Amino acid sequence: MGTARFLRAVLLLSVLLMVTFPALLSAEHHDGRVDICRLPSDSGDCLRFFEMWYFDGTACTKFVYGGYGGNDNRFPTEKACMKRCAKA
């Protein structure tokens, strides 16, 4: 039973890394700076509920932010998100 649980955890971690790592690589500029608008949505580590906005690659979308952690693809308003991330 313990081995199955461990293998399941390893599999889950592997899948998360396969999804997250390429997204982080593609968010990097040639000079090493990170384009925050290309980072994936990240609700953070806490359990509070703040309605925020992130850029999903084509539009600004609402999500619930936990209040701590996460990444910089997080904006207090749709307008702030669009101003930073929408390409004219």
Swiss-Prot record:
Record's InterPro entries?
Kunitz_BPTI (IPR002223), Kunitz_BPTI_sf (IPR036880), Serpin_venom_toxin (IPR051388)
How would you summarize where this protein is expressed among tissues? Expressed by the venom gland.
Query: Function, please?
Result: Serine protease inhibitor that inhibits trypsin at a molar ratio of 1:1.
Cysteine disulfide partners in this protein:
37-85, 60-81
The opening ranks of the lineage are:
Eukaryota, Metazoa, Ecdysozoa, Arthropoda, Chelicerata
**Where does the signal sequence lie?**
1-27
Q: Which GO terms describe its biological process?
A: envenomation resulting in negative regulation of voltage-gated potassium channel activity in another organism
Please state every residue range assigned to the domain named BPTI/Kunitz inhibitor.
37-85
Cross-referenced CDD domains: Kunitz_huwentoxin
Q: Where in the cell is it found?
A: Secreted
Database matches in Pfam families? Kunitz_BPTI
Q: Could you give one GO CC term from the UniProt record?
A: extracellular region
User: Where is it chiefly localized?
Assistant: secreted
The similarity annotation says: Belongs to the venom Kunitz-type family. 03 (sub-Kunitz) subfamily.
Q: Name the domain of life this protein comes from.
A: Eukaryota
Q: What is this protein called?
A: Kunitz-type U15-theraphotoxin-Hhn1g
